[in-house]
Amino acid sequence: MSGSECLTLIGEYVMAQEIERKFLVDGDFRSEAFKAVRITQGYLSSVPERTVRVRVKDDKGYITVKGVGDESGVSRFEWEKEIPVDDARELLRICEPGVIDKTRYLVKVGTHTFEVDEFYGDNEGLTVAEVELSDENEAFDKPSWLGEEVTGDAKYYNSMLMKNPYKNWK
C-alpha cells in the first residue's frame, strides 16, 4: 500500500488517508483518456464532519465513509467497501435528495492517473480533475487542459454539488 492508503486497520478493512488535489478542467482531455465509467452516487449523510456515500460504478456497488479534511483540504480519512450492486441501488433510493450522475475518465499523465469527472443533470457543464498523491508535497505533471485549482473549496465536493448544484451558481 502507498503512503496515502495505509493508516489504520479496523477489523479487516483499512482506514485510508486520501491525499488529492482537485482542479477545474479547461480544455479537451478525452483523446488522452484510457478508460471511462459511468457513476451514480448519493449520500446517506453529508454533514461536514463526515459523509457516507453510496455509489454504483458500472456493475459494482460501494459504500464509503469520508472524514473531515485537514486545513488545506488536501487530505482526509476515507474508508470504502464493495457491496452488492443491488444493495447499492436500493440504498440510493433512501439517500438525501440530489443524486450525482457523472462519467469518470482516467487519464495517465506522467506517473499519475487523473480522474476527470464530467457531470450531468443539475451539474451539467462542470468538469473537474483529481489527482491522488502519496504525500501533500508530491510533485506531478500538470497537463495543458488542467485549469484553476479548487482543492479545499467545499462547493466542488460531490456532497455539496447535490445540495447546491452547478446550475444554481450562474
What are these regions (language model features)?
Residues 3-170:
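Phosphate-end processing signature that detects enzymes handling 5′-triphosphorylated RNA
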